[in-house]
Structures are given as C-alpha cells and as structure tokens.
Design a protein with these regions (language model features):
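Bacterial N-terminal signal peptides that target proteins for export
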Residues: 1-9
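Hydrophobic alpha-helical targeting segments used for export or membrane insertion
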Residues: 9, 13-17
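C-terminal motif of bacterial Sec signal peptides marking the signal peptidase cleavage site
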Residues: 19-21
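Catalytic centers of hydrolytic enzymes
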Residues: 23-279
Length: 279
C-alpha cells in the first residue's frame, strides 16, 4: 500500500455516498491542512475524477502532479528530465469528501490534499533506457482496446510531465504497445539501446519506486542502488501533495494562468472514457 498519514487516518477512510452531485461529505473528518479553504490555484475546465479518467486518459491533475515532480529538484546539480505519477495515486474518495469532479475555477489546498491522499515521498532516480521504455510498457499494458468497456482500469497508468510525450497502440500485444516516446522533447530510440551507461533521470513517488502497481519487475532495486543516485525531494517534507500544492501556486495562480489538460499521451486503437458534452 502507498505510504499514508497514519494507520488511524487510513482506517478512518469511511467514504460518504454520492447523492447526485459532485461531492458527498462524511459524517466526521479532520482537515488535512491548516487552512483547507486557501486557494492554491485555478482550473481552466471541469476535471473528472472517476477512475476511467484518472487511469485511462490524459488528465489535468495527473499532469500537474507530474510537472511538480519534474521541478521538485530544479535547484540540484542533477535535476529530473521526466516526472511521472501513477493514476492510482489520484483519489476521488478522500478522508472527508468523495467527489466525481472538480469544477472550473479555484482549487483549494484542502481539495488538493484530499485528491493526493497518501503523502508519498517524491524521489528522483537514474533509469536505463530499457528500464524507461519498460516502465512505459507497464503503464499502458492494461489499457483496454477500442470497443471494449473500461471496467477495471489499472492504477499503473502513468501521467507524464510537460515536454514529454507517449504514443501507444492498444491493438498491439502487451509489452509492445509503445510506438513513440519523447523525454524533454528528445525522442527515445525504439527498441531501446542496451547501453546501460545511457541514463534518464526520472522523478516519481516512492510507491512506484518501491515496486507498487507492478513496477517492481521493471525497476528492481533502483531506489536503493547508490549507482542510480536516488534523491528524495528536500522541500516541504518531500511529499507529493505538498510539492504539488506549491507548484500549483507558482504556475496557476490566476484564472488567466489556469491549469489545462494537454494531450501528452496519444492513444491509438484504445478505449477512452466518454466525456460529457462541452468537454
């Protein structure tokens, strides 16, 4: 399981039932931050929170988190080239509130911490080119083929940081679905080169790096290998929610600079969730 605030907080995850609106409040809960109503930034459109959206499509919140990871160690001598976050770490059911969507407009610190609930640590580590491509294959391996119903989307699906992109063909077999990959605007050769001296510095949460969502078979002990230079984020306790909130404040502080979803993953022959008219 991902790292959480405490055992008691995890056991307290008694989620309220939806009642035809966007949110339903639990009977009792405690705010996760000192000022839950403080606005940390603005959303440029409605953001849907069902698993079909967070785990099977591009997603504004997932892209925000990946961007925050990318820039978490900008002041280090070896900053990240790519930030990734698994869709399974984005939660619609929080300790206090269950949501189906976030409306366009202001996003509060309390909302953001409910959505990024587990307080995973952010770690930057060197991956070989093969590990990077295999990581992307793990990300898209469980995507449903076009025409299929998305019934149990995998939390392993990765959202990518700005400047990087992925093209995936779901008609191809698992392990051979990645058709194109760029990191920081530079194309990654496919198939990947076997030269282990070629490294990509990637920021991710410790849950993935420790093998969660099936990534152990890809990453092995990379997070514990000094030769991979693993570095935990130093600011704001090093946790994903705090780092993302600070990044949101700096990059999307006004409606004019509102967060917008981008097409960073291009899907070919893949099932996609149906979006309401106008989105």
């Amino acid at each position: 399981m991902p790292r959480s605030r405490s055992l008691l907080a995890t056991l307290a995850l008694a989620v309220g039932t939806l009642h035809g609106g966007c949110i339903a409040y639990n009977d009792s809960c405690q705010p996760l931050v000192e000022d839950p109503d403080a606005v940390v930034g603005y959303l440029g459109h409605e953001v849907f929170l069902d698993k079909n959206f967070t785990r099977h499509d591009n997603h504004a919140l997932g892209q925000l988190v990946a961007d925050a990871f990318l820039h978490a160690e900008d002041d280090s001598t070896r900053p990240a080239m790519l930030g990734v976050v698994n869709g399974g770490s984005l939660r619609q059911e929080g300790l206090c509130v269950t949501r189906t969507s976030l409306r366009k407009g202001p996003l509060t610190d309390g909302e953001l911490h409910e959505l990024i609930l587990f307080e995973n640590l952010v770690v930057t580590v060197d991956l070989t080119e093969k590990e990077l491509v295999d990581m992307m294959e793990q990300s898209v391996g469980a995507l449903y083929v076009e025409g299929q119903s998305i019934t149990f989307p995998s939390g392993a699906f990765l959202h990518l940081s700005s400047g990087s992109s992925l093209r995936v063909d779901c008609s191809r077999p698992r392990g051979a679905r990645v058709r194109a990959l760029t990191v920081g605007g530079t194309s990654v050769p496919l198939p990947p080169r076997e030269d282990v001296s070629i490294r990509y510095r990637v920021a991710m949460n410790a849950y993935i790096l420790d093998g969660g969502d099936g990534y152990g078979a890809v990453l092995g002990n990379a997070g514990k290998d000094p030769g991979r230079n693993p570095v935990q984020a130093r600011k704001l306790g090093g946790t994903d929610a705090n780092i993302t909130a600070a990044y949101m404040k700096s990059k999307h502080p006004t409606p004019v600079q509102a967060l917008m979803e981008e097409q960073r993953v291009v899907f070919e022959n893949c099932a996609l969730p149906a979006r309401p008219a106008g989105r």
